[in-house]
Regions:
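Positively charged n-region of N-terminal signal peptides that target proteins for export
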Residues: 1-5
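Exposed beta-sheet edge and beta->alpha loop/turn motif
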Residues: 83-133
C-alpha cells in the first residue's frame, strides 16, 4: 500500500509544476509563431534550442528551412494547443494550425527546459489521422 501512496503523492506534487510548464511551453511557441508572423526570423530563431541553432547556424538558414519545410507556421492562421505530454528529454506539445489556405495541420513541438525557460528542440508534422475522432 505504501508504494501506491508514494506514487500518488508524487503525482499530486508534480501536477502544479506541470501546469506551469504547460503555460510556459505554450507561451514560447506562441512567441515564436508571432515572430514568424512579423517576419522576424532572428527573434523566432532565439526560441530554438542550442542544438537546433547549431544545426542551422543562424536566422537566414533557419528562415529558409521554415519556409520550405514548415510553411504552415510562417504567417499561420488559427492555432489551437492540444495535448502536452512528457517525453524522455522534456515535453511534447501538440498543436493544430491552419495555413493561409485554411488547411489544418497537426504538429508536435518537442520542448526542452534550459534554466528557467523552455526552448523548441524540434517540430514534427503529424498525420491528421492521428487526431481524427
Amino acid at each position: 500500500m505504501r508504494p501506491i501512496s508514494f506514487i500518488c503523492a508524487l503525482f499530486f506534487l508534480a501536477a502544479p509544476i506541470f501546469a506551469g510548464d504547460k503555460e510556459d511551453i505554450q507561451a514560447t511557441i506562441s512567441r515564436q509563431l508571432k515572430a514568424f508572423q512579423l517576419d522576424d526570423f532572428a527573434k523566432a530563431f532565439s526560441y530554438a534550442s542550442p542544438s537546433i541553432q547549431s544545426i542551422f547556424g543562424g536566422p537566414d538558414n533557419f528562415e529558409s528551412m521554415v519556409k520550405r519545410g514548415y510553411p504552415m507556421v510562417w504567417k499561420p492562421g488559427k492555432v489551437t494547443f492540444l495535448s502536452v505530454d512528457p517525453y524522455h528529454h522534456g515535453m511534447a506539445q501538440n498543436i493544430q494550425i491552419f495555413d493561409r489556405n485554411k488547411k489544418a495541420h497537426y504538429l508536435r513541438y518537442y520542448m526542452v527546459k534550459l534554466g528557467d525557460s523552455w526552448k523548441i528542440s524540434g517540430v514534427e508534422i503529424l498525420p491528421s489521422s492521428d487526431f481524427s475522432v
